[in-house]
Amino acid sequence: MMIFRKNIVGKYLSEWRVQSNNLGLSDREIFIFITLSFLSTATEVFGLGMFLPIFQFIRFKGDVDELVANSDVWQYIIDGFSYFNIAPSLLVLLLIAFGLFLARQFFTYTRLIYDTIISQRLIQLQRNRIFDGYIDANTSYHDRTPVGSVMNIILTEVNGAIVSIMLPMSMLVYVIMFSGYFSVLILLSWEMTIFSIVAFLIASMIPKSWINKSGTVGRKLVNANTLVSEFLVGRLKLPRLVRLSGTEDTEKSEFHKLTLRQRKNYISGAILKSKTETLMEPVVIGLSLVFLYFSYTMLQLQVEMIGLYLVIIMRLMPIVKSILLQIQSIKGLLGSSEMLKESLRVIEGSKEKNNGVKLISQLNREIALKHVDYHYEGRKVNVLQKNTKY
């Protein structure tokens, strides 16, 4: 079963990498994004982990011998302080923890900006590819493809498709964070680790059906968006014809049906996400409180370890929830991703081949084209001003 799951994950990652490269996301950009994510996670985990020696330092009132005797971690801390010739103190420990959290904020800020830069570049690239391909396509493609469908892809579905490409990298951020905090739990107590695994597995199974339904709802929403765009392009170009034909009420009624369908699909998707977001936390919190009771009454764990466990669990909950929401969002955006992929395939296969051009080796007389211009309605710019091909 585990091998089967690993094969599925490996196949998905391989397909995602190929699709990402096809849309313009380079391996170098992926590496930089993952590196920034790892650095932000590492600094956060170490910053949070510093609270354990801080609590221990306070409990033993700074007695280094007692600290080393009661905790293996403190021997490494003492060695580190000795290397830099610094005396262990509460102030230094607090400054180190604060410095690590500041570093985490810096790496997080850099990652968020880098994510936005990459996303917007990919969105621009796909929009340019669709428009350029549409202009270069043959008349057969123009005749069979509604303008509204192309508009919907460029203005709406490209955004969703690029988000679906970027989401696996964002999800990887949370997986790295989860692994980091989980390693801290292992250092604290194996009992805590096993219980946390059970709690999060139970909580993760709850939204499984809602996540699967998101894919169907997402495809329905893409279809609804396409129908609305096609309807608008066809009607807004000829409003006088609608008035003259006396079909105003019919057209209004039809448009209202389309927007109602659009609204229902949006609401269905939002409900599925809300269920995933809200119903997982009570399960984890309830199980954590049960474990807190047994860890205090039966396992006799130290107070600082129990406190740090609760802090980590409270931090892990939004991480696990975010991973599930990322998976659900990827499912919900499959429709946009599939539409963009299919549109690019069809457009690239419909490119018009210019076989009617003959090269002229010489001219007996001069050919001159003068004062050739074209203006779009409401625009003063001559679009042929810099064009030398007529």
Task: Cite the ranges covered by each PLM segment.
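Juxtamembrane loop-to-helix connectors within ABC transporter transmembrane domains
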Residues: 22, 115, 135-181, 237, ...
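Membrane-integrated ABC transporters
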Residues: 1-49, 59-97, 103, 110-115, ...
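Hydrophobic transmembrane alpha-helices
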Residues: 99, 103, 232, 309-322, ...
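A hydrophobic transmembrane-helix motif
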Residues: 103, 169-211, 267-313, 367
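Primarily ABC-family ATPase nucleotide-binding module
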Residues: 344-390
